[in-house]
């Protein structure tokens, strides 16, 4: 089986399974295309009762010491992390890497279980920062420099990506806003974030895109205006399409090219 695999990781807090893993016993379920591992995880800071699930794309490598830039991609409302597989992210990434169009990268796709919950009341963003990122960086071959770490999302996932990236400005080098439904922060908050970080934290690269028929196009334009008002650099792409998987699938290759081209990769220096 190719080393290019998408792993579905289940976090849990069962001491029994943790003990098995400490003894070198893995609980693994295999299929023809993917390998799924059940692994325990417990935050050192916060004890959550519900598990986090995520899929991860790992590029093929002959050198086990290789480390790669990492991209965190967040799905939209009424979806889960399987949407990325359904849109062909593995095949697209494989093709781009194998043809030399992009450098290899790791792609992490977490599931938001309570996607109907108000973002303002959800702990999902904190769990990404406090649990998921530390776990990924401890268990997978990823670079830990913020310039080598990106976050992006589609629809509600774009809202989450913006909230996480700006609440923790300096944690990510790139932010992708794909079909952003609305501006997350007030104009003043955006102004303060950039003013407070000026000269201290490298500017985050931002790509915003939306379809011409997207009913939420105004969200992308509103965020673009906020950035323009504070003279923050960004890329705005408006192309034919709506607010749906067909639009995202059509542009998924463009997304991966942008992330890979802008993520810092010492192997390319």
Give the residues covered by each predicted segment.
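Bacterial N-terminal signal peptides that target proteins for export
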Residues: 2-15
């Amino acid at each position: 089986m190719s080393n290019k695999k998408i792993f579905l990781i289940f976090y849990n807090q069962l001491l029994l399974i943790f003990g098995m893993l400490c003894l070198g016993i893995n609980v693994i379920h295999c299929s023809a295309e993917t390998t799924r591992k059940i692994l325990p995880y417990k935050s050192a800071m916060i004890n959550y009762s519900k598990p986090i699930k995520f899929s991860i794309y790992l590029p093929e490598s002959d050198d086990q010491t290789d480390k790669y830039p990492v991209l965190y991609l967040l799905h939209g409302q009424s979806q889960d992390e399987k949407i990325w597989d359904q849109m062909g992210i593995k095949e697209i990434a494989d093709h781009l890497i194998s043809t030399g169009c992009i450098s290899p990268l790791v792609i992490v796709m977490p599931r938001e279980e309570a996607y109907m919950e108000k973002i303002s009341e959800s702990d999902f963003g904190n769990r990404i920062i406090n649990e998921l990122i530390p776990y990924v960086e401890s268990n997978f071959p990823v670079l830990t420099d913020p310039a080598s770490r990106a976050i992006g999302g589609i629809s509600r996932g774009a809202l989450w990506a913006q909230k996480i990236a700006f609440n923790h400005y300096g944690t990510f080098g790139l932010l992708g806003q794909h079909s952003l439904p609305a501006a997350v922060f007030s104009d003043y908050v955006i102004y303060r974030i950039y003013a407070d970080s000026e000269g201290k934290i490298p500017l985050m690269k931002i790509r915003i895109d939306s379809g011409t028929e997207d009913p939420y196009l105004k969200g992308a334009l509103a965020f673009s205006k906020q950035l323009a008002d504070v003279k923050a650099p960004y890329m705005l792409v408006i192309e034919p399409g709506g607010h749906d998987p067909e639009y995202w699938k059509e542009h998924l290759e463009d997304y991966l090219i942008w992330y890979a081209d802008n993520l810092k990769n010492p192997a390319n220096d």
